[in-house]
Curated annotation (Swiss-Prot):
Domain of life: Bacteria
Record-given protein name: UvrABC system protein B
Complex and partners: Forms a heterotetramer with UvrA during the search for lesions. Interacts with UvrC in an incision complex.
Pfam families on file: Helicase_C (PF00271), ResIII (PF04851), UVR (PF02151), UvrB (PF12344), UvrB_inter (PF17757)
Record family assignment: Belongs to the UvrB family.
Its biological purpose: The UvrABC repair system catalyzes the recognition and processing of DNA lesions. A damage recognition complex composed of 2 UvrA and 2 UvrB subunits scans DNA for abnormalities. Upon binding of the UvrA(2)B(2) complex to a putative damaged site, the DNA wraps around one UvrB monomer. DNA wrap is dependent on ATP binding by UvrB and probably causes local melting of the DNA helix, facilitating insertion of UvrB beta-hairpin between the DNA strands. Then UvrB probes one DNA strand for the presence of a lesion.
Domain UVR per the UniProt entry, residue ranges: 648-683
Length: 693
């Protein structure tokens, strides 16, 4: 039976809901892309200048072709940014976020020179883990799905067939033995916990079973009448408030690496066979220490798998569990998509090389582990896809970039251009200046911009030069900050926000001022040592850096150089080509460039507003009670039954959790907690107005 036959998929249309309509080059680009995809072209390039709305064009393309879509992005930060944009544009469709769930990850490794074995060590971000499970759940239960993912999506994941085989189907009126259902939940790696009810656990209260699936924020309640499922409800796991009644629900396994008893028994037999062969090899090479090490580690893992159906590092045995041949490709997120899915690769000039590099980096570490008896050779088949395996799995692909690479340009049959911005803004003018006296000239240009309440980006070649320049500018009264690789992600977001707000006027950086930096207030980008050929001054890097000034009406780029290199010439020629097209369009259509008004806001803003409101409400509720007792507000008749005193305690606790989540960059979780606090405060206000508080 196919996956589609086992699951009744939700089929809903992709629908963009926005106050804006396609403008500038967008209508033509959307029409051209749609025609090419519908005509079966396998590779399509969208050459979109910075600020032309490539993300919105992608959303409208998805609406036109009506296909599940995987959007691959170069890093987690841009993935989160893009996922939020798609959620705003397609609010009624499933927009999922799939990135590595490790906040910290140290893979197991062995250093032969010092005889040092490094154990695997990691810290998992639970909210990101939930979003990963949510992505696979959506892909298996509906078609209107967009998954925004980093290249981690090509790493091994359990097979969709086995994942669906472990699925438990719940339907009103079905006859099911309650104890048998509990055994099924345990079999797919859910844990019974009647005290601490959270994701991946279930609890039992008489004829009522409640479970929180790994991919859900809400819990499920199954009410039995004898051996019959009488009612199924979705409820709030914290308050017990019933959200809606369900007719049929699916509960997928609590791990992507789940295997039924029969498959696990076969896997154990295969592992034992491989172990016997490998031990013979090692002993034949007189590697007795390695043989003993491998015997102990593998035997322990086998005992855990026989007793528990699981072991730490079970992914290293995924080849045997999946029943794959040696050297064959693992399953990954792409295998969860239907055959007709669309692949979109954002900033393809950066993302594509990452895909190709993943396999070799992983393989060099694992070879050492296998050679020294820490892992069986089959562990090397728990890996990311090779480049050719990746190409075999993807169908039609759209490459998005302001500077497409040679690979995608060679693959595509023509290029779709998106040069005209909806705002009418044109690419910045590029001015070449001599390096002699460049710092004094830069200082004068900065002062001119500061008088106009505009911002400046300066990019240097070395860390030393960036530090010296920052110190020099500070000494001359310029409000300047230095953005470097040691600045953590949260502080980087704050720095960029402070630049836009005018807390300081100049930001100095090295290679941090390229893709994904959206700063409409910046009117000048100064590139020092522009004529020094290399990675940081390649044509691609220069075009991307020039694009940072493309969101301001009076944007300019100053290149300090004593000669014009080939890279400079290519970047300037491409910029001038785009400017000519943009100016001609504006003249023909009577368009006046309008400044881009982009809201300066983020999760920290909403948390600050929430804090002020919470403080006011709690003061009015007579806050000042003793601390130390945690409320247990799980009620079956909704929030109305929760005492006001407990509600106040709960609001305080969730507010603290909200700030903790934001501090750890768990913005999705922080936003969800903010919404929960809002609901609880609404209930408390109703109590106050009714005279109960």
């Amino acid at each position: 039976m196919s996956l589609a036959q086992q699951i009744n998929r939700v089929v809903a249309p992709f629908e963009v809901i926005s106050e804006y309509q396609p403008a500038g080059d967008q209508p033509a680009a959307i029409a051209d892309l749609t025609e090419r995809i519908n005509n079966g072209e396998k590779d399509v390039v969208l050459l979109g200048a910075t600020g032309t709305g490539k993300s919105a064009t992608t959303a409208w393309l998805i609406e036109q072709v009506q296909r599940p879509t995987l959007v691959m992005v170069q890093n987690k930060t841009l993935a989160a940014q893009l996922a939020n944009e798609f959620r705003e544009l397609l609010p009624n469709n499933a927009v999922e976020y799939f990135v590595s769930y490790y906040d910290y990850y140290q893979p197991e490794a062995y250093v032969p020179q010092t005889d040092t074995f490094i154990e695997k060590d990691s810290s998992v971000n639970e909210e990101v883990e939930r979003l990963r499970y949510s992505a696979t759940n959506s892909l298996l239960t509906r078609r209107d799905v967009i998954v925004v993912a980093t290249v981690s999506c090509i790493y091994g994941l359990g097979t969709p067939e086995e994942y669906v085989a472990g699925m438990v189907t719940l339907k009103q009126g079905d006859r099911v033995d309650r104890d048998q259902l509990l055994r099924q939940f345990v079999g797919i790696q859910y844990t019974r916990n009647d005290i601490d009810f959270h994701r991946g656990t279930f609890r039992v209260r008489g004829d009522t079973v409640e479970i929180t699936p790994m991919y859900e924020e809400q819990a499920l309640r199954i009410e039995f009448f004898g051996d019959e499922i009488e009612k199924i409800f979705t409820l709030h796991p914290l308050t017990g408030e019933i959200i809606r009644e369900e007719n049929e629900m699916y509960v997928f396994p609590a791990s992507h690496y789940v295997a039924g008893p029969e498959r696990m028994a076969k896997a154990i037999t295969r592992i034992e066979d491989e172990l016997a062969v490998r031990l013979k090899e090692l002993e034949g090479q007189n590697k007795l220490l390695e043989a003993q090490r491998l015997r102990m580690r593998t035997t322990y893992d086998l005992e855990m798998m026989q007793q528990m159906g699981f072991c730490n590092g079970i992914e290293n045995y995924s080849r045997h569990i999946d029943g794959r041949d040696s050297g064959s490709a693992p399953s990954c997120l792409i295998d969860y998509f239907p055959d007709d899915f669309l692949l979109v690769i954002d900033e393809s000039h950066v993302t594509l090389p990452q895909i190709g590099a993943m396999y070799e980096g992983d393989m060099s570490r694992k070879r050492t582990l296998v050679d020294h008896g820490f892992r069986l050779p089959s562990a090397m088949d728990n890996r990311p896809l090779k480049w050719d395996e990746f190409l075999e799995r993807v169908g039609q692909t759209v490459y998005l970039s302001a500077t497409p690479g040679k690979y995608e340009m060679a693959k595509a049959d023509g290029v779709v251009q998106q040069i005209i911005r909806p705002t009418g803004l044109i690419d910045p003018e590029v001015i070449i200046k001599p390096t002699k006296g460049q710092i004094d000239d830069l200082l004068g240009e900065i002062r001119t911009r500061v008088e106009r309440d505009e911002r400046v980006l300066v990019t240097t070649l070395t860390k030393r030069m960036a530090e010296d320049l920052t110190e020099y500018l500070l000494g001359h009264g310029v409000k300047v900050q230095y953005l470097h690789s040691d600045v953590d992600t949260l502080r980087r977001v704050e720095l960029l926000r402070e630049l836009r707000l005018g807390v300081f006027d100049v930001l100095v950086g090295i290679n941090l001022l390229r893709e994904g930096l959206d700063l409409p207030e910046v009117s000048l980008v100064s590139i020092l040592d522009a004529d020094k050929e290399g990675f940081l001054r390649s044509a691609t890097s220069l075009i991307q850096t020039i694009g940072r000034a493309a969101r301001n009406v009076s944007g300019e780029v100053h290149m300090y150089a004593d000669k014009i290199t080939d890279s400079m010439a290519k970047a300037i020629d491409e910029t001038n080509r785009r400017r000519a097209i943009q100016v001609a369009y504006n003249t023909e259509h009577g368009v006046d460039p309008t400044p881009l008004r982009k809201r300066i806001a983020d999760i920290t803003d909403s948390l600050a507003r929430e804090d002020a409101d919470t403080k006011s409400l709690l003061e009015s509720a007579g806050k000042g009670r003793s601390r130390g007792k945690a409320p247990v507000p799980v009620r079956h008749d909704g929030l109305a039954a929760v005492p006001a005193e407990d509600l106040v305690d709960l609001i305080e606790q969730l507010t603290a959790q909200m700030h903790s989540a934001a501090g750890e960059l768990q913005f999705e979780l922080a936003a969800r907690l903010r919404d929960e606090v809002g609901d609880l405060k609404k209930e408390l206000r109703q109590m106050q107005s009714a005279g109960h508080a």
